[in-house]
Every structure is written in structure tokens, then in C-alpha cells.
Amino acid sequence: MSRTENIEHVEESVESELKQPSMYKVILNNDDYTPMDFVIEILQLFFKKDEQQATEIMLAIHHKGKGICGIYPFGIAETKVAQVNQFARQNQHPLLCSLEEA
């Protein structure tokens, strides 16, 4: 095997090993009880949205039944879902945060 063939083989191996992680959407689901201000607070606190972005997402949740807070690798998405659901329960709101593959 020539040196050129070895280099090409190594380049192929490296490219196939560097796959992007699967990404997941973090979703807030609408309910009839959680105040809009609380949803905005969640979006600012956990997803670092400014007031305008948080308001737009909150309105999408209100009108469409759900809204995307962000798209993250699985581990981060799973952590954010758990944090939001725990924070909502601590504040006695039924708000549900979930994830789905992007």
C-alpha cells in the first residue's frame, strides 16, 4: 500500500467518526392555568431569551398549543426539560416541558 493510499484511508476514517450529535427540540406545551408572565420568566431564566423573544414564543405557545424554546443535543435538552418541569411544580403550575427529535 502506498503512502497516498494510507492518507486517504485515514481521512475517510476521521470523517466517519465525527458525526454531529442528534439534536432535540425543547417544547413548552400550552395549558389553561399557567400565567403568561410565568412562561416568559421560564423562557428568560432557562433559555436566555430577551423579553421580546420570550413574548413571541409565549404567544406561539398560547395560540398554537406549543412552542419551541430551543434546539440542543440530547443531554442538554433533557436537563432543560427536567429543570423547567421542576421549577413549574415548585411554583405550583402545571406547565409541561417536553422534548422531541429535531
Curated annotation (Swiss-Prot):
Role this protein plays: Involved in the modulation of the specificity of the ClpAP-mediated ATP-dependent protein degradation.
Coiled coil region boundaries: none
InterPro entries according to UniProt: ClpS, ClpS_core, Ribosomal_bL12_C/ClpS-like
Subunit field text: Binds to the N-terminal domain of the chaperone ClpA.
Organism: Shewanella pealeana (strain ATCC 700345 / ANG-SQ1)
Protein name per Swiss-Prot or TrEMBL: ATP-dependent Clp protease adapter protein ClpS
GO biological process per UniProt: protein catabolic process; proteolysis
Domain of life from the UniProt record: Bacteria
Family label: Belongs to the ClpS family.
UniProt cross-references to Gene3D superfamilies, sorted A to Z: 3.30.1390.10
